[in-house]
């Protein structure tokens, strides 16, 4: 008798073309589930003028309507007639298993409620490592209260909890949650070969590219990088490439004007990876409650030397000075780290080789997604 193809539903606050670490995590995880023979249904929010029902490489996508309030930072689902129709379609997909990304997004409550109503097993994948901060003590205080209240509602459904890093596992204990294990954020094993030799920008043989790729928000530490680069006064063959969009972009472009600093704006995945393939030093100076940053894994597999802060699971990847530099969260530390790698080519190349090898051996979806078999 032929085995029934199992269908997995993934509930996530955002999905592509919204470009962030969790969205790339969802994309790569579900792509590998499809390769392993699963049907995949993604239930997300409609953060723009996108089709409410879509298909992408074997994955069915349902985009729920949202209210217009802060929809680009925290989507609030609008439970109108369109919502009811879409959720009826999801019910008709004959789901076998539910995966919810993050405790903090309201789509997780939707997914867990759906699983309960349909008597389905469910898991929550946590991507955090501390309370979210907007650098305002008053707002952060109430934000932490909100997170505890929301987490209590999530726990009420009794899902199994997993995390994308060991540090995320430890953070869940803050909410009296014992995670079942770690499902590491990962990258495709073929990423290195897919983008080897590609280029997004013109680059001479003696040019050095220092790159940041991510959202342009204060919490990501982007201004630390701009300050550190500007104070270094490097020779004309050293360039800082800033890829990404966000509320701080216009202000930073105005403040940091230099022939050696390029603000590239929002790039698609292929453009970003082609830039990574040209990158000598990738910097991720985040002060954000990360899980395990996707861009560190991508840059590392594409053989960039990495400088990053000790946030989330970063130190589980860069767990030795032979693999990269873990900086302090200040301009001076980043300035010194940049100087070291710009001036020491041998060290830079050694770190590039070592981190690429480590990620290929331990942080690829081909290995990670096996933990989702059920």
What does each of the following model-derived ranges do?
Residues 121, 130-153:
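Nucleotide-sugar donor phosphate/pyrophosphate-binding loop at the beta->alpha transition
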Residues 148-181, 187-191, 251:
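A short, active-site helix/loop in glycosyltransferases that binds the activated sugar's phosphate group
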Residues 162, 187, 202-220, 226-230, ...:
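Conserved donor-binding/catalytic core segment of Leloir-type glycosyltransferases
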Residues 250-270:
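Nucleotide-activated donor-binding/catalytic signature segment of Leloir-type glycosyltransferases, i.e.
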Residues 266-267, 274-279:
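Short alpha-helical donor nucleotide-sugar binding micro-motif in glycosyltransferases
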Residues 277-291, 304:
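Acidic donor-binding loop of glycosyltransferase active sites
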Residues 296, 305-308:
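Short hydrophobic beta-strand element within catalytic cores of glycosyltransferases
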Residues 320-332, 340-346:
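Conserved acidic donor-binding segment of nucleotide-sugar-dependent glycosyltransferases
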């Amino acid at each position: 008798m032929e085995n029934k193809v199992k269908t997995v539903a993934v509930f996530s606050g955002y999905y592509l073309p919204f470009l962030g670490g969790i969205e790339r995590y969802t994309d790569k995880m579900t792509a590998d589930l499809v390769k392993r023979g699963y049907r995949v249904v993604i239930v997300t929010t409609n953060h723009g003028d996108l089709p409410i029902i879509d298909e992408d490489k074997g994955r069915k996508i349902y985009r729920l309507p949202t209210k217009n309030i802060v929809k680009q930072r925290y989507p609030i689902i609008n439970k109108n007639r369109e919502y009811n129709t879409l959720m009826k379609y999801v019910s008709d997909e004959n789901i076998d298993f539910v995966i919810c990304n993050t405790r903090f997004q309201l789509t997780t409550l939707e997914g867990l409620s759906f699983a309960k109503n349909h008597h389905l097993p469910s898991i929550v994948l946590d991507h955090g490592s501390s309370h979210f901060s907007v650098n305002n003590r008053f707002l952060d205080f109430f934000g932490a209260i909100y997170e505890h209240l929301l987490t209590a509602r999530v726990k009420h459904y009794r899902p199994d909890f997993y995390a994308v890093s060991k540090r995320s596992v430890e953070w869940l204990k803050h909410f009296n949650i014992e995670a079942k294990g770690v499902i590491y954020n990962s990258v495709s094993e073929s990423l290195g070969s897919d983008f080897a030799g590609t280029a997004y920008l013109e680059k001479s043989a003696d040019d050095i590219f220092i790159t940041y790729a991510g959202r342009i928000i204060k919490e990501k530490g982007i201004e630390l990088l701009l300050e550190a680069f500007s104070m270094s006064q490097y020779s004309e063959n050293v360039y800082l490439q800033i890829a990404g969009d966000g509320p701080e972009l216009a202000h930073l472009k105005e403040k940091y004007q230099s022939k050696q600093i390029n603000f590239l704006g929002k790039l698609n995945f292929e453009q970003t990876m082609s830039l990574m393939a040209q990158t000598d030093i990738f910097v991720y100076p985040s002060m954000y409650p990360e899980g395990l940053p996707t861009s560190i894994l991508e840059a590392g597999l594409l053989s960039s030397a990495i400088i990053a802060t000790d946030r989330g699971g970063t130190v589980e990847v860069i767990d030795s000075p032979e693999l990269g530099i873990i900086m302090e969260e200040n301009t001076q530390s980043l300035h010194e780290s940049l100087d070291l790698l710009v001036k020491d080519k041998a060290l830079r190349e050694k770190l590039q080789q070592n981190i690429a090898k480590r990620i290929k051996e331990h942080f690829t979806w081909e290995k990670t997604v096996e933990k989702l078999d059920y």
